[in-house]
Amino acid sequence: MRKQRIQERSLIGMLITLGVVYGDIGTSPLYVMNALINDAGQLKNATPDYVIGSVSLIFWTLMLITTVKYVLIALRADNHHEGGIFALYALVRHRAKWLIFVALIGGAALLADGTLTPAVTVTSAVEGLKGLPKLGAFSQYPWLVPLTVTVILLVLFMIQGFGTAVVGRSFGPMMLLWFTVIGIFGLINISQAPVILKAFSPVYAVQVLFNPANKMGIFILGSVFLATTGAEALYSDMGHVGKANIDATWPFVYTTLILNYLGQGAWMLTHYQDAAWRNATNVNPFYAMVPAGGQIAMIILATAAAIIASQALITGSYTLVDEAVGLKFLPRMIIKHPSNVRSQIYIGAINWLLCLVTLGIVWLFQTSAHMEAAYGLAITLTMLMTTILLSQWIHMKGHRALALALLFGFGALETVFLTASLTKFIHGGYLTLGLTLVIFLIMVVWFFGNRRRLRYNQANEQISLLDYRNQLIQLSHDDHLPVFATNLVYLAKVDHQHRVKRSILYSILDKRPKRAKVYWFITINETNRPYDCSYSIDMLGTRNIVEVQLNLGFRKSQHINLYLRQIVTNLIADHSIDPQYSRYGITQPRQVGDFKFVVQNQQIMDLASNPTMGQFDRLLIGGRVLLQNITPSPAIWYGLAFSDVLEETIPLFTKPATDATLTNLTVHHARTPQRNSRQP
């Protein structure tokens, strides 16, 4: 209900939107114009034609890609109010099988390029300290900037596990202040050089691509593209704040951003021939256009905005990974909910992996100029993949002409940006492309390895408990076998037809049968209510086979052993199962017996046992099993670390391979059994 209220257009919703959605795109003015000066070589090379044309490129890039493609079109492609490339893929995946590769490439690139966003944003903000005479140490000792950035980011990553709801309440007002201030300073500087308003004409945007002052040629678009890298995050965060609030706030955000870019351009026009600036190679007009008396306050505000942008990126990464897990693109991970809001999650493994890579990038590149040279390459891939999926969605809605126009129009535009960004490869873009490739391969191996395994693997065939009910009852009362456990528990997904994986009954009945007083098959359902804790029981017409549907809220601890003990106690009190008296124990009398939890793992040793399996399938399935075995065990997910847990290795294939390679030649000295004979 609270999320629904936030998604409706309201002042509170719009304020939250400013803090959640626009962190990345809103802090781009910190480094975009700086990157364009670096492309020119020195400020004196930034001629009026170069500056006006560059700002014009920024204006029209934000207009076409962010406003038209994402705000006006993409936000309408919501999946139950959720946005982002994986949510979009879920809408169109039935249209063509190859679309999965589009989604995997886009998602992998978005995750990979996200490691650079906190690094470049916070570094650009902190580098403003170099321009303060009272803090000359930052200019004298270059390592102070990455050290300061490291401390800020390390603290930011450390507080993630505690939840950011309290801090998050200040994000909206802080970003409102940020956009207002940068817009005002931009407007002040525009008044010093009104000629910069020519940038609204697309003619200057086209001319600068061929202007001699532009030494980069078309590759200048690699720096211009940095202004719109946050557009994909804008779409991904739709589920947190709602389309209506983004529609209402984007005109304000867009206006202040353009005012600031125009203001920076105006400052460059009025200072590019000044003796104090003309030979400068690393000038950031964002800080330079602020009066000296206000620079400290601006640096503090910029750092706060950079932290907010980084926070939004981190939580966005959690959401993206959570969606990938739901689509079976990635292995299951331990996900925590620090607050009562369902969408606010924390994934420790992703948090610290992101922290490690981001800090590594900070120390590898050390300056924002070096980071800018590497930033944006992978995200162009994501935008291109989103365009492909978006055209499929529009076509699905019956607008074929519009779908083709979007595919070829934005596809061509983003292909040009991708081509222009290829120069970033040798300047560090190889790092994000390498990360993209690694993440992509992991998702391919997990998803397709699972699908290929299901093709060969009869261990995952669903079979009904009802068909084996009599065997389980007989096994439970078979005095010829020792009791394996009083309560034998399998964490199994049981459907409404009482079907479970074949491997579970294979574990109980085959090999060495496991005799137990009661067999438990528990299905754990996570609900949207934070503290939900309920269960339902199906005894299957017996007294020793129990199906449990355990419903736990997303904030409820998943200590299954404690819940199960309560369920057993209640069933004994209801006379649904027999008391489980124990002869020994420090607490007597005790009606609840012992528990044995069985967790099944697969190994790759028997991959060679199926002669019909191709080498590529063998590689995919083996990789999938290896990934499964290095991720947390279900015993950890369900709080069974101190319980009696049997980690059982099961074969990939429970049906023997039909490879008729043996021929029986003869049997010597066989002994025929005698009727009624008692001979050994």
UniProtKB/Swiss-Prot annotation:
Location relative to the cell: Cell membrane
Gene transcribed to yield this protein: kup2
Function in brief: Transport of potassium into the cell. Likely operates as a K(+):H(+) symporter.
GO cellular component entries: plasma membrane
Family the UniProt entry places it in: Belongs to the HAK/KUP transporter (TC 2.A.72) family.
Keyword Ion transport: yes
Domain of life: Bacteria
Topology of this chain in the membrane: Multi-pass membrane protein
Segments passing through the bilayer: 12-32, 55-75, 98-118, 143-163, 170-190, 216-236, 249-269, 288-308, 345-365, 374-394, 402-422, 428-448
Keyword presence, DNA damage: no
Record keywords: Cell membrane, Ion transport, Membrane, Potassium, Potassium transport, Symport, Transmembrane, Transmembrane helix, Transport
Pfam families to which the protein is assigned, alphabetical: K_trans (PF02705), K_trans_C (PF22776)
Protein name: Probable potassium transport system protein Kup 2
Catalyzed chemical reaction(s): K(+)(in) + H(+)(in) = K(+)(out) + H(+)(out)
